[in-house]
Regions:
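Predominantly soluble domains enriched in secretory-pathway, periplasmic, or organellar proteins
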Residues: 1-182
């Protein structure tokens, strides 16, 4: 059992399951639980109210519904006793200010290789493309006719398993049976 501050709205676990981030907009903070030690590890104070957390292989991306910035927390730094550094990167110029945020819609998603993320800024009608380690967007997509309220990426690529010449992908089959793969 671990106590976190009042006002927590969501919690997300990193891909390895070591760290659980508890989003607390009222406190303008993210509480980080160390599951290996079964205790609250630290509280990361933020300048803006956090609303969502997404994990790449290197960073936790913290989205703020009321800010034009993203906060990044380096996962490998969490095991150190010192405070985890928070990187602030721009997400456009205009602040979303929560006006267009809808429950159930995630305003960001991981890239298929987990080396970055895409993030929607509905006020600017832009989806920004981030690569881990960069301090600004790598690119952007303008959605001229509509406000991007959420982002979902579908990965339909093949990946080579090592250098074996064997490729693999993940698919979903609706029914059991025998399938011919051309």
């Amino acid at each position: 059992k671990t106590d976190v501050a009042e006002g927590a709205t969501t919690l997300e676990a990193d891909p390895q399951g070591r760290w659980v981030f508890v989003v607390n907009p009222e406190a303008r903070a993210v509480d980080i639980i160390d599951t290996a030690a079964a205790r609250l590890s630290r509280r990361v104070a933020l300048d803006e109210k956090p609303s969502h957390v997404l994990f790449s292989s290197i960073f936790a991306y913290v989205y703020h519904a009321d800010s034009s910035n993203l906060s990044l927390v380096k996962l490998s730094a969490l095991a150190d006793a010192e405070a985890a550094p928070v990187l602030i990167i721009p997400m456009g110029v205009e602040r979303p200010e929560g006006r267009l945020v809808r429950p159930g819609l995630l305003p960001m998603d991981l890239l298929p290789d987990e080396g970055g993320a895409v993030v929607a800024n509905p006020v600017e009608k832009v989806i920004y493309f981030y690569t881990d380690g960069m301090m600004s967007p790598t690119g952007s997509f303008k959605t001229w006719a509509s406000n991007p309220l959420g982002v979902i990426l579908y990965d339909r690529s093949l990946r080579e398993r090592g250098n074996s010449g064997v490729y693999e992908t993940v698919t979903r089959l609706d029914e059991p049976g025998v399938y011919d793969v051309p």
